[in-house]
Each structure stands twice: as structure tokens, then as C-alpha cells.
């Protein structure tokens, strides 16, 4: 209830029940008490979000409740007052989404289970099968849609840097794209609703570390030349040291020096092996 002393006249009161609001016109007359009444035409809705029908309540889930101009949202299992009629529920857990339409009757007290088919995936990587695990946070995991678009690309669903981190995912089939240095690997995987999935990516890669005292720039290029006689650049940087993650194979290392030094550029060969660190020194 609400009480106030008002001058005689016509007014509009605004009443709220949660996010449900109603406007009530009323008139105050001299010497009398106005008693406007409001009918919210609403119900009490408790949303119970789950990843699968047999899983526990998901406390991290967000549910948006909409009907026309009405909007409200709750987290985890929670209650909101909603207007009667058809109400749209949109639940989300990370990138996973689910929608349902409920028919609400005024005065009801409803508890509704909203299933948002989703799970989590934990990605790890090794440099080679049965080889050393990747520990650097420079590695990037991207979960992509299994189907390609018309232009041949895949939609990014989620992504993280570093290994062993949890990614929220909708249930379904996907492709994990993994990048470290100049290495990129794609591997299919499946997420089951209400479950935790683990994927271990074989990068088939090694590390090439180059030291070149006095160098101005170090470049790693392909050993073969194209029809124009040029070698494709793979990686490079200014300075006397350079390190890169590469697929196994033979590479050329080009070292250039400041013009003032009067030194000629150098080129040497280097071989990278899976799960190994190759250290190459370019003498002065």
C-alpha cells in the first residue's frame, strides 16, 4: 500500500511488481480518500536452467524474459514476476543458447525447467604424439563450427589462450583450430550436453632458436624458390635472436647486417624435428 496527501485533481499512479508496471488513473476529491486498485495481470515464474534434463541446476546460466516491451533477466535458479500471455525465455551459458515460449496465466506460480544444451571442453596440446606437452600461454585454441560457410570459412564459437582452460560450448560437433607460432592444426571434436570433454592436439611441431651476433635482422624462409626465384618468408624479426615454432622440415635462415658494418648477408640451413628444440648459431 501507498499513502500520500494530494491536492484535489486527476492523477495517474504507476505501480510495479518486479519489472511488471501498470498505470492507474484516479481522482482525488476534497474531503475524501481515493483508493485506486491495480490488477497486474501477472504471474510468479521460477526458472530452473540446466545443461541437460538430468543435470544439476546451472548457476552460471542467464535467462532473459521478454514479452512486448517487458524485459527482465535472472541468473541461475531464480524467480521473476512476469505478465500474463506468451512469454519468451532466452537462456544462455557462454555461447550456448536456447529459447522457449511459455503461456502464462495471471495469478499462477510456475516453476519451469529450461534446458540449454551445453557442456565444457578443455584443450591441451603436445609437440608430437606421446611427446612433450605444450605449456606456453602463447598457444591459441579456437572452437569453430563444423560446417563451413559459402566462402569456406568457419564461425568462431569460443576461444582461449593457454592449455587446460575451460571453454563453454553448446552441444554438437565442432572443429578445434590450434595455433602456436607458425603452426596451425585443426581437429574435429564433439561436445555432449551436461558433460566435460577433453581434447589433446598433436601439433607435430618443433622449435627453431637462432642466435646471430651483430645481426640487424633474422629471417626464416622456405628452402625452395618460386618461379620468380624468391623464397617465401615464414617468420622474421629485428635483433640478434629469433625463435619460432615450426612444422618439421628443412628451412633457410637469412641473416642481414647494418649497412654501416660492411658485412655481407648470410644464409644457412636448419632442420626442425618434431618435439625437439633446434638451436642454430650463425657465427660472426
Predicted regions and their residues:
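Intrinsically disordered, low-complexity segments enriched in Gly and acidic/Ser/Thr residues
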Residues: 204, 211-250, 255
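Short, recurring structural edge motifs at helix starts
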Residues: 33, 48-51, 74-77, 109, ...
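Post-signal-peptide, soluble extracytosolic/periplasmic N-terminal scaffold domains
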Residues: 1, 5-17, 27-34, 44-58, ...
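Short Pro-Gly-centered beta-turn/loop motif in secreted/extracellular proteins
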Residues: 2-12, 16-19, 40, 77-95, ...
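A short, amphipathic beta-strand motif
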Residues: 44-53, 114, 120-130, 207-214
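Short beta-strand segments within Ig-like beta-sandwich modules, predominantly Fibronectin type-III
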Residues: 1, 26-28, 68-74, 102-104, ...
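Structured interaction patches on ligand/partner-binding surfaces of diverse proteins
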Residues: 17-41, 94-117, 180-204, 258-284
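Short, ordered, surface-exposed loop/turn motifs in non-cytosolic proteins
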Residues: 1, 51-69, 128-154, 214-231
Amino acid at each position: 500500500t501507498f499513502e500520500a496527501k494530494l491536492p484535489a485533481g486527476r492523477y495517474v499512479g504507476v505501480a510495479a511488481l518486479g519489472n511488471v508496471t501498470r498505470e492507474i488513473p484516479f481522482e482525488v476529491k476534497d474531503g475524501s480518500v481515493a483508493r485506486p486498485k491495480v490488477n497486474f495481470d501477472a504471474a510468479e515464474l521460477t526458472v530452473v536452467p540446466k545443461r541437460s534434463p538430468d543435470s544439476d541446476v546451472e548457476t552460471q546460466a542467464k535467462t532473459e524474459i521478454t514479452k512486448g516491451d517487458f524485459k527482465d533477466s535472472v541468473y541461475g535458479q531464480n524467480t521473476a514476476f512476469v505478465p500474463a500471455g506468451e512469454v519468451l525465455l532466452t537462456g544462455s551459458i557462454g555461447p550456448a543458447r536456447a529459447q522457449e515460449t511459455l503461456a502464462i496465466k495471471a495469478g499462477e506460480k510456475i516453476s519451469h525447467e529450461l534446458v540449454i544444451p551445453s557442456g565444457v571442453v578443455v584443450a591441451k596440446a603436445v609437440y608430437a604424439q606421446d611427446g612433450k606437452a605444450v605449456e606456453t600461454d602463447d598457444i591459441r585454441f579456437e572452437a569453430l563450427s563444423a560446417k563451413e560457410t559459402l566462402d569456406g570459412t568457419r564461425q568462431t564459437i569460443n576461444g582461449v589462450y593457454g592449455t587446460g582452460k575451460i571453454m563453454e560450448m553448446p552441444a554438437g560437433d565442432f572443429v578445434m583450430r590450434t595455433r602456436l607460432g607458425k603452426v596451425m592444426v585443426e581437429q574435429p571434436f564433439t561436445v555432449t550436453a551436461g558433460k566435460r570433454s577433453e581434447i589433446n592436439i598433436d601439433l607435430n611441431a618443433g622449435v627453431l632458436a637462432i642466435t646471430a651476433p651483430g645481426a640487424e635482422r633474422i629471417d626464416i624462409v622456405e628452402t625452395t624458390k618460386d618461379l620468380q626465384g624468391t623464397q617465401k618468408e615464414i617468420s622474421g624479426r629485428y635483433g640478434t635472436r629469433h625463435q619460432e615454432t615450426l612444422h618439421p622440415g628443412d628451412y633457410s635462415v637469412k641473416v642481414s647486417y647494418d649497412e654501416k658494418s660492411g658485412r655481407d648477408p648470410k644464409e644457412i640451413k636448419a632442420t626442425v624435428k618434431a618435439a625437439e628444440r633446434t638451436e642454430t648459431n650463425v657465427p660472426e
